[in-house]
Regions:
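Mature extracytoplasmic or otherwise solvent-exposed domains
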Residues: 22-23, 32, 49, 79-81
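Short, solvent-exposed positions on alpha-helices
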Residues: 42-46
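Interaction-prone helical segments in low-complexity regions
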Residues: 1-3
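N-terminal acidic leader/helix
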Residues: 5-41
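Helix-rich interaction surfaces within compact, conserved domain-sized segments
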Residues: 50, 54-85
Length: 85
């Protein structure tokens, strides 16, 4: 016997939208901070790790989504700034 999927309430949709918006703001601010340059490579990596932790806190069990959506942006930026290959 299969159960029908439940439809999320407006409050649940609003809450998820707030969490998405918060994560997007943090990611954009983190990218901007790293892009300013002048910080050690390790500090840039710590910023990425902090953004990843926030994503996992906001969306438990969805760390793979961060890796698909945001990690490539961080990698491109860090590679360009620190001339990594």
């Amino acid at each position: 016997m299969s159960s029908a999927p439940t439809i999320p309430s407006n409050a649940e949709i609003d809450e998820e939208s707030r969490r998405i918006r918060r994560l997007r703001i943090v990611v954009n601010m983190s990218l901007g901070l790293i892009a300013q340059g002048g910080m050690p490579y390790e500090e840039a990596q710590e910023i990425v790790a902090a953004a990843r932790r926030l994503a996992e806190d906001l969306f438990p069990g969805k760390g793979h989504v961060f890796e698909l959506l945001y990690l490539p942006q961080f990698r491109r930026l860090i590679s360009a700034l620190y001339r990594l290959q």
